[in-house]
Structures are given as C-alpha cells and as structure tokens.
Amino acid sequence: MGISVAGMVLWAGTVTGAEAARSTGRPNLVLIMADDMGFSDIGCYGSEIKTPNLDKLAGDGVRFRRFYNGARCCPSRASLLTGLYAHQAGMGGMEPDRKVPGYRGNINKQCVTIAEAMKTNGYATYMSGKWHLTRHARAWEPEEPKFNWPRQRGFDRFYGIIGGADDYFAPRGLVRDNTSIGQEAKDDPGYYFTDAVSDSAVGYINDHCKNSPDKPFFAYVAYTAPHWKLMALKRDIAKYKGRYDEGWDVLRKERHERMITMGIIDKKWPLSPRDERVLPWKDATASAVGGKVEEALKIT
C-alpha cells in the first residue's frame, strides 16, 4: 500500500485500499497547496501556529529551504500544474486578458496539466479547493465559459471555487464539477470552506478505494487558507486569544530565532530591516490604518 503526498514537502505514507500502488508500481499521489502562506507560517518552519500534522509529515519527508515561484496566485498555480514557466502556460500575471502571449488570463491549450498527464497514464484524478487558472470564474452565471475549468483540464471530479477568493462561510462561487452550488453553502449554518475542501478530498479518496481499488489516483487539494478574507472558526480564534498581543515586531524576532535554531536559515543571516511604513502594533488602530489608506489613495 502506498501514497505519496506533496505540499511544501514530499513524503510517503499509507492509505486503506491503495492496492493499485503495490500491484502496478504507480503510487497514489496527493498534492496539497496552501494559499498566500508566509515562509514561516507553519510550525516546521518556525511558526507559533500549531500545525502538528504538517510538522510530522515534514519530519518524515523533505523540508525545502530554497524555492522559486511566481509570488502570486495564478502564475504559481500555472507553473505548479503544468511544469512550465507561468508565461509559457499563458498566465504570466493574474487573470485579466492583456491580449499578448503569456498574459491571456487562461492556461493555454499548448500546455498539458498534471491532471491531463496523469489521466493519460491511467490515473483517476480529483480536485478539491481553489482553481484560479481562468478569467472565466463567475460560476453563478449560467453562461460563463467553462472550457478552462478543472473538469475540462483533466480532473474527473471537482469541488471548490473557480476564482481566487471567496467567503469562507458562504462562498458564492462554490462549484461541484461544472455546477454552481453556492446556495448549498449559504443554506448550511455550519459550513466552513476549509473543512469542506478537506471533507471533499477525503470523500473522493474513500469512494475511489471502494469503487476502483485497482486504479491509482491523483488528488489535488488546494486550500484558500490562509488567503484573505481572514475568516476563522470561533474555536480556532479562541485557541490563540492573547498570543498576538505583543504585536508583529516581537513576533518576527521570535520566528527569526526559531528558524535559526531549527536550521532553516543560517545564523549569519540577520533579521531583515523593519519596514518603517508599517505602524507599530500599539499604534495600529482602525483610524490610523484608515488614514494610511487615505494617504496612499491621494498619492496614486
């Protein structure tokens, strides 16, 4: 039995019913992606945030310290899912169509997604979470073009959002396969998108192991968390009550020290200079922050 999982790291583990990996030599694969997450935002990279499951996976696998990405949603996802530079895949920037090659707001037909490649090689393919590889993301519009949605780019099943961000408690752009189901989330008082993405991925894998045990699978699990909007469950907010009262200046020093201790960065690397444009935590009141926004608008 075998399953390989990739997120910030690669590792191996097990999943019930994964006979295909043993019989064919082709492992089941799970690719996990977080959204807009900082380098030190999980425990195994020096964070104060508790992430025991990710820490264990990193401890059993490989923890990368050097990387390159497109720094924004669409280009990073385009590269991740095609193996190409973002411009080669057609998404050198975000989703607006700039009418020039490399900036068309859709991954192009000249590239092959990992789902399309896996499917060609006999894999079942599943996706849960955020797509954000097309400018056609108004899922609630019946006539919205779907030629570049997950189902049309190699995934057998899809649950999530097509666009870049949505409400965590009632995502308007929620989609199942090619059908808009935003109202389902709105009608569910206990709905939370992060949990729903996890539940969907687990459901796909369980169904696969029950119905197609001799076929390998690839599952892509792409959370919107911790991307804005910053919307957490009350129980999670309560867990960290008071933890950030000292402010970000103290926090950044603590993280820097932990990263050195953990061997993630060299002790010779000093803490980066503080951005003087950022207010000290004690001064970051709503009125002060609002004033900063107003100043920026006047300049632009």
Regions found by a protein language model. Give the residues of each.
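Formylglycine-dependent sulfatase
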Residues: 1-9, 13-300
